[in-house]
A protein has these predicted regions:
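N-terminal export signals
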Residues: 2-25
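Dinucleotide-binding Rossmann-like beta1-alpha1 core, especially the glycine-rich loop
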Residues: 73-152, 270-272, 280, 303, ...
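Central helical "cap/lid" subdomain
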Residues: 222-263
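Flavin (FAD/FMN) cofactor-binding and adjacent substrate-gating region
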Residues: 7, 96, 107, 119-188, ...
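Glycine-rich FAD pyrophosphate-binding loop
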Residues: 51-69
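Active-site lid/adjacent beta-loop-alpha segment flanking the redox-cofactor pocket in flavoenzymes
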Residues: 259-358
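C-terminal catalytic lobe of FAD-dependent flavoproteins
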Residues: 325-405
Length: 405
């Protein structure tokens, strides 16, 4: 996608209504939709579809925001400037969509920007180029020195001479609270939430639509959305198509509420941190656990918790110690919760959004970052499902691309 296409799609997308009544006004019957997955992406799809008048049922195997959405750093940003233009556009528009949703409900989001810095092992040499590319694409981003960064985050301790990227319009979302809020809003519009329910099979019906077999019963629907994060790969296989992923684990720790310390999202090479509106500081790391057979065996089932509270505490204190080197005011924080987040990510790193190959009933919505993209993806999925209108913004992200791999 070149810059002209980018600007054309940007103009067209901003003209789209938040909730379309086209299908209802034309007299066309609205589809009955099952959403598999009660994370932030599934919750956004459910709310947007329910707002259009669709009959919506959400099936969840574990709990609301129990998987990736409950263990996510939840930094809202437009990407890194090295990604395809179409993906950059999707993320950029999603930031605006979060603001639009916040006009309809009290979404717990803070728009305090972000500061990112790196070391040699994490791509420090490419950061200036990425900032330049982001600016060329229309994203407000600046390269700062240490003094400039300290004016934004007082007390920040980074090595002299370190360049930092300032993303002025980035934000931070409370993922679990946002997911619950979206589902509550969907339920107020008639959506149903069923859990714990495991999907055992997904099959096409001879007369059209799809039958979802669970561990307790079967549900007939016109459409099903697979939005189960890392679990979407197995669901896709049951539905008869391939959706490979390269999932990655990361430790997330939360402190007890504390007075305001962080004025922005801080994303360092070995730790990242943000402070929610409730005072809790979220700590995370980009690198996963060390490689080795012991870790591989323990992580094979993708657990969200550590096997021993003492091990969890060690990981939390490790992240806190790293964060405190950059922001000494965090040294007195108390770790309250530590978990493992599994990032859903299709094998080529790009979202997989749209109908499965050869199907008009099975729709996928799996991606990284779901926190950033969820607001827009829910809206666009509702347009495609309720209105039956393909959205050009999603053309590069169809799941059918894996069929030819």
């Amino acid at each position: 996608m070149d810059r002209r296409d980018f600007l054309s799609l940007l103009a067209a997308s901003t003209a789209l209504p938040l909730v379309s009544r086209r299908a209802r006004a034309s007299g066309t019957a609205l589809p009955k939709v099952v959403v598999v997955g009660a994370g932030v992406v599934g919750a956004s799809c459910a709310w947007h579809l329910a707002a259009r008048g669709c009959e919506v049922t959400v099936l969840e195997a574990h709990g609301v925001a129990a998987q990736a959405s409950g263990h996510s750093f939840a930094w809202l940003n437009a990407g890194d400037g090295l990604q395809p233009m179409s993906y950059h556009l999707l993320r950029s528009l999603a930031l605006g969509e979060h603001r639009r949703i916040a006009a309809h409900m009290p979404v717990p989001v803070l728009w305090n920007g972000s500061l990112e810095w790196r070391d040699a092992a994490h791509g420090a040499e490419t950061l200036p180029e990425e900032v330049l590319r982001m600016r060329e694409r229309g994203t407000e981003m600046h390269l700062l020195d240490v003094a400039g960064a300290a004016a934004i985050q007082p007390g920040l301790q980074v090595a002299p001479g370190t360049p930092l990227a300032w993303g002025a319009h980035d934000g931070a979302l409370n993922g679990p609270a946002t997911t619950r809020l979206l589902l509550e809003q969907a339920q107020s519009l008639g959506a149903r939430l069923r859990m714990p329910v495991r999907v055992r099979d997904i099959a096409s019906r001879s007369g059209g639509g799809v039958r979802i077999t669970t561990d307790g019963d079967s549900i007939d629907a016109d459409r099903v959305i697979l939005a189960a994060g890392t679990g979407t790969t197995a669901l896709a296989e049951r539905a008869g198509f391939a959706l490979p992923q390269k999932t990655k684990a990361g430790v997330i720790a939360l402190t007890a509420p504390m007075p305001p310390v962080l004025r922005t999202v801080l994303y360092g090479p070995d730790v990242h941190m943000l402070q929610r509106g409730d005072g809790r500081v979220v700590l995370g790391e980009k690198d996963g656990p060390p490689a080795g057979p012991a870790h591989a065996e323990r992580l094979a089932s993708e657990p969200n918790a550590f096997p021993d509270p003492a091990i969890a505490a060690q990981h939390g204190e490790r992240l806190l110690a790293r964060a405190s080197r950059y922001v000494p005011a965090l040294a007195g924080a108390r770790i309250e919760e530590v978990g493992i987040g599994w990032r859903p990510m299709p094998a080529d790193g790009l979202p997989a959004i749209g109908f499965a190959p050869g199907s008009s009933a099975v729709y996928t919505a799996v991606m990284h970052s779901g926190m950033t993209l969820s607001a827009l993806v829910g809206r666009l999925a509702a347009i495609e499902i309720a209105d039956g209108t393909p959205v050009q913004l999603l053309a590069d992200f169809r799941p059918g691309r894996f069929a030819a791999a």
